[in-house]
């Protein structure tokens, strides 16, 4: 073989090798240290690290939604309200390591110095958009503001935030999976109940809804997503007409006038509701209390609405209101399935130990 031919073969081999290296690197071009341009919920264009390794999440719901993406190991500090041994939110129970992490300041935004001390690559902020921009300006750390919407009228907003989290952490498939799963459950609930005629639906009410603290029987959320999902006859919507899910407190006289046949109450506030009934004897005449049709739900909110609990509550409500349409559903099993999907671990039983749910409660004794 001539030297020229040997040289040609070597040259060709080098070209093939270089091309292969280029193709391989091209298929995995998003390496650690890469950045991606995103637009957050406040409309801010931000360059953020792709799949950051050190993350702080502050504000209502921020940490919860990151846990839906199995990002616990990336969290390097938590707000003070996320620490302690008396926490029973679904994501806290499924990720006990969180309470052992260093504090980054109070709830609703944390403290700048404590956040910076944890050297995060990225901050997820869900409190105030102005505070998010200010935090980025003062720290030089990318801060992404998200809002997370809710499961009813602002569901698409929550889905878009999931998609953004998926983009940042290279978990687009997980975001799509969560969106599809959520929509499938809501569709299933609606399909089971859409043909039930109004005169066959009992009058229902839900009370004891927490909002920036615990509240008694007159605290409601309207529209109440679980009721809407199962097309329930919610007496509160006879008088309260809100476009978005809104927490409000009604007058005692209003509840007495509505006189619901069935009442669902937030299990985290049963003690307050019992106090209400003891303090105001007129409540004892309500049809729901007289017939024993008062049932407990998983806590609706704890530092923002609890996605899995809301969906699980809807199935339990459906089972109580329309047993034939939900004959194949065992509510506790469904709740465990839902929490395991969102958090990787079924936590109903652990929540239930603290806040007994999916059961009748006697408010008269």
Report each predicted region and the residues it spans.
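Proline-aspartate-enriched helix->loop->beta-strand connector
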Residues: 104-107, 112-125, 251-268
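Alpha-helical, coiled-coil/dimerization segments enriched in small aliphatic residues
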Residues: 219-246
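Extracytoplasmic substrate-binding proteins
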Residues: 35, 45, 134-213, 296-364
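Structural recognition of the beta-strand scaffold that forms the well-ordered cores
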Residues: 56-58, 76-79, 122-126, 143-146, ...
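Bacterial N-terminal signal peptides that target proteins for export
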Residues: 2-14
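A short, structured surface patch at a secondary-structure boundary
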Residues: 57-117, 122, 232-235, 243
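Bacterial N-terminal signal peptides
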Residues: 13-25
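Sec-dependent signal peptide cleavage junction
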Residues: 24-33
């Amino acid at each position: 073989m001539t030297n020229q031919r040997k040289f040609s073969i070597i040259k060709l081999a080098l070209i093939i090798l270089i091309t292969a290296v280029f193709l391989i690197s091209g298929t995995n071009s998003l390496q650690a240290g890469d950045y991606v341009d995103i637009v957050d919920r406040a409309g801010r264009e931000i360059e953020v690290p792709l799949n950051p390794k050190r993350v702080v999440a502050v504000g209502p719901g921020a940490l919860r939604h990151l846990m839906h993406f199995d990002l616990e190991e990336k969290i390097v500090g938590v707000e003070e309200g996320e620490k302690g041994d008396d926490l029973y939110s679904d994501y806290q129970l499924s990720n006990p390591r969180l309470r052992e992490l260093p504090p980054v300041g109070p709830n609703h935004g944390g403290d700048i110095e404590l956040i910076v001390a944890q050297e995060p690559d990225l901050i997820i902020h869900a409190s105030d958009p102005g505070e998010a921009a200010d935090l980025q300006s003062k720290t030089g750390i990318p801060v992404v503001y998200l809002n997370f919407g809710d499961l009813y009228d602002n569901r698409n907003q929550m889905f878009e935030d999931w998609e953004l989290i998926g983009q940042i952490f290279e978990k687009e498939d997980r975001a799509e999976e969560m969106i599809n799963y959520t929509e499938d459950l809501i569709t299933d609930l609606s399909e089971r109940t859409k043909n039930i005629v109004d005169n066959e639906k009992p009058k229902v009410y839900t009370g004891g809804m927490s909002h920036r603290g615990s509240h008694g029987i007159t605290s409601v959320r309207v529209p109440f997503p679980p009721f809407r999902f199962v097309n329930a006859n919610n007496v509160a919507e006879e008088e309260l007409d809100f476009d978005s899910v809104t927490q409000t407190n009604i007058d005692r006289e209003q509840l007495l006038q509505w006189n619901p046949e069935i009442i669902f109450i937030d299990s985290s506030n049963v003690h307050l509701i019992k106090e209400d009934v003891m303090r105001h004897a007129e409540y004892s005449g309500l049809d729901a209390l007289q017939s024993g049709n008062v049932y407990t739900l998983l806590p609706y909110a704890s530092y923002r609405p609890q996605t899995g609990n809301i969906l699980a509550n809807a199935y339990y409500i459906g089972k109580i209101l329309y047993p034939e349409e939900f004959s194949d559903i065992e509510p506790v099993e469904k709740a465990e399935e839902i929490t395991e999907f969102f958090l990787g671990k079924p936590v109903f039983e652990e929540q239930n130990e603290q806040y007994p749910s999916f059961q009748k409660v006697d408010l008269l004794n």
